């Protein structure tokens, strides 16, 4: 007899292998079997405290089962830190929409999504929206999309334009803010004023991600305490050098990956 965790709950079992265990539990050959964070149908010897999941394909697991699966995928300590993280994304265009989706998929527990704009056709070349979203506020469309990816995280939306007046009150309960504006003026305003009001919060900005070409020129740099910039610092959007999906996504990946690293290392 050994004790394992099955779908997030402790269970005593006499079965010695995963095949014996799942064939006794699962009545549908299409069910997904997950052992210690990995989906597999191989026959593996079971050990004390193994984490096992049997999930019906094409259905949403209950909240506790999904949470337990993500803990197994990420390792428990990391998952708990991400789940307790509070992150704001400012600007929900090509950068911000993908940053928010990355963080939702990773299990960040609270997202504050801020933008004033609506979705229009020119956004579709790089932003995480669909034709069916045209005319919707980006905040509302992105919340709807994220709710279909991870319905168990908390999402707050603010459909407004950030300025020096409202900046001082928007991020009082936020650990990390991702700046993802299109406007150079808005970027400068955020970089110059954010730490006047939030000395202990982290700001991650973006600069230089337009065009195509060298992927590795996009880097993450620490500029000062609690202040980071992702991008190549050179290629801004301009006439003849527009924003294109691949490099925008690379930069969004840098920003969202840095969020995970910072939350993981948070004391």
What function would you assign to each model-found segment?
Residues 23, 31-38, 56, 172-176, ...:
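Glycine-rich phosphate/adenylate-binding loop
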Residues 1-11:
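Eukaryote-biased recognition of intrinsically disordered, low-complexity regulatory segments
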Residues 115-150:
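Glycine-rich phosphate-binding loop and adjoining beta1-alpha1-beta2 segment
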Residues 7, 31-46:
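Short acidic beta-strand-loop surface patches of small beta-rich interaction domains
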Residues 15-27:
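Short amphipathic, charge-patterned alpha-helical segments
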Residues 139-174, 181-183:
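A structured beta-alpha segment of the ubiquitous adenosine-cofactor-binding alpha/beta core
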Residues 42, 47-48, 53-86:
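N-terminal charged helix/coil linker that caps or initiates catalytic domains
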Residues 78-115:
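Glycine-rich adenosine-cofactor-binding loop
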């Amino acid at each position: 007899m050994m004790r394992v965790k099955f779908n997030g709950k402790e269970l005593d079992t006499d079965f010695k292998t995963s095949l014996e265990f799942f064939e006794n539990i699962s009545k549908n050959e299409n069910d997904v079997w997950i052992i210690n964070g990995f989906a597999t149908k191989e026959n593996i010897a079971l050990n004390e405290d193994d984490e096992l999941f049997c999930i019906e394909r094409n259905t949403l697991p209950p909240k506790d089962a999904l949470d337990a699966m993500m803990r197994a995928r990420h390792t428990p300590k990391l998952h708990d830190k991400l789940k307790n993280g509070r992150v704001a994304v400012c600007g929900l265009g090509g950068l911000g929409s993908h940053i928010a989706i990355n963080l939702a998929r990773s299990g960040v527990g609270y997202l504050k999504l801020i933008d004033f704009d609506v979705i229009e056709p020119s956004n579709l070349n790089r932003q995480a929206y669909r034709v069916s979203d045209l005319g919707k506020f980006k905040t509302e469309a992105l919340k709807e999309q994220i709710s279909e990816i991870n319905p168990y995280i908390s999402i707050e939306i603010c459909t407004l334009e950030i300025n020096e007046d409202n900046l001082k009150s928007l991020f009082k309960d936020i650990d990390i803010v991702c700046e993802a504006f299109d406007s150079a003026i808005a970027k400068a305003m955020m970089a110059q004023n954010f730490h006047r009001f939030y000395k202990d919060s982290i700001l991650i900005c973006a600069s230089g991600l337009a065009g195509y070409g060298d992927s590795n020129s996009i880097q993450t740099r620490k500029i000062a305490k609690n202040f980071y910039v992702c991008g190549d610092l050179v290629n801004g959007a301009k006439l003849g050098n527009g924003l294109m999906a691949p490099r925008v996504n690379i930069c969004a990946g840098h920003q969202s990956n840095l969020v995970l690293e910072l939350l993981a290392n948070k004391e």
